[in-house]
Amino acid sequence: CEFTLAIAYRYQWDEYSVPTYPAAGVSAPIHFRAAWVLSIAEALGGAVTMRIAGGGKPVSFSIGMFPFDLRTLTIVGGMPECAWMYWARGQIDCFYNPQAGYSMMLGTQAKRPGLQAGYEKGVAGAVGALTGCDDLHYIGVLSFDDIFSPEQMAADIELCHLLDHLRRGIPRDDPQEWVAVIREGLEKGYMQVDTTLD
């Protein structure tokens, strides 16, 4: 088990990391809020244990969770709940470590590139972009994490560019210039004015 290895090699490592990823309905309660409480308790307990067992070496931890489909007996990456769980994970991690980043998985259950992969990855990415995510991962990955597709990777890179544009929002400009900008195109329209062409 991981704990036995950590103890056996504790003098060789400078720091430890304790992640938790229970599956709701299998290794955690099906009710998400209760599952989060369990996941937090596991991470904090593991971090304290490793801090003591490691002789006071630094310990980081990340709290996570995945939805589980009891019909197919698989962790699923394309459900809306997965995007929500990644968002909640980011909030919890930032509570314990204000410098922590927030990552969103572009997950899908699709087995090949196409409509299902596009909308599942797009929903997760949009949630991440609109809620402050600073990292998108699982580029080119399909079937949760079983298949890599170069074609899907190309589509995901384009999606990331689009989501980055969405995340940046409408550019801020100087309100003092608005009247001049409006006046510039009143007679001929705005297609050929300097501000449009710039």
Language model segments and positions:
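Catalytic-core signal marking the mid-to-C-terminal active-site face
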Residues: 151-198
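Glycine-rich anion/phosphate-binding loop at the beta-strand->alpha-helix junction
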Residues: 1-159
